[in-house]
Amino acid sequence: MDMVKVNSMDFGEFVDVFGNIVEKCPLIAAAVWSQRPFSGLEDLENHFFAFIDALPRSGQEGILRCHPDLAGRDLQQGTLTAESQREQSQAGLTSLDTDDRLRLQQLNAQYRERFGFPFVLAARLSDRATVPRELARRLQCQPESELRTALGEVKKISHLRLTDLLGAHSHSARVELP
């Protein structure tokens, strides 16, 4: 999909296509649509990120709370979004043995208890061995620092999802704006 197509989308189509760039947060896509036209991937991405950055802390935490636990209940029940299912699968989290899954569930619960939102990590940039180590490491972080780190992971996930949608056109096709 190229940027000309993106810029020509009506509101409903744009939200349908980009509504899960930030996990379960179609409101962000709805707000970003109003910023058209976009000159390219980076411009579109910057509008998503600016929306996140402009939110008060409660809104930013809300975005984090929309993410599923890695290898958690949603995975076990088959209720992950298609994007999260694919990302967790690529990281090897859909095929953990029982001991690894239980360990990750325990760490996820400790993290959620400490910070008030689930552990967020760009799973596609990780693997099944790294996830629990990173979760244990981040459990030691201060809340303010961890909020920034988790939001950074949301942005990594969003970048990957936007790149997936825009494909080969994402880096090469730029639209000249009036």
Swiss-Prot record:
Coarse class of the protein's main subcellular location: other
Gene Ontology molecular-function annotations: 2-oxo-4-hydroxy-4-carboxy-5-ureidoimidazoline decarboxylase activity; carboxy-lyase activity
A Pfam family that the UniProt record links to this protein: OHCU_decarbox
Catalytic activity: 5-hydroxy-2-oxo-4-ureido-2,5-dihydro-1H-imidazole-5-carboxylate + H(+) = (S)-allantoin + CO2
UniProt: substrate binding residues: P68, S84, Q85, R86, E87, Q88, F119, V120, L121, A122, A123
Signal peptide region: none
Pathway: Purine metabolism; urate degradation; (S)-allantoin from urate: step 3/3
Keywords per UniProt: Decarboxylase, Lyase, Peroxisome, Purine metabolism
UniProt function note: Catalyzes the stereoselective decarboxylation of 2-oxo-4-hydroxy-4-carboxy-5-ureidoimidazoline (OHCU) to (S)-allantoin.
Protein name stated in the entry: 2-oxo-4-hydroxy-4-carboxy-5-ureidoimidazoline decarboxylase
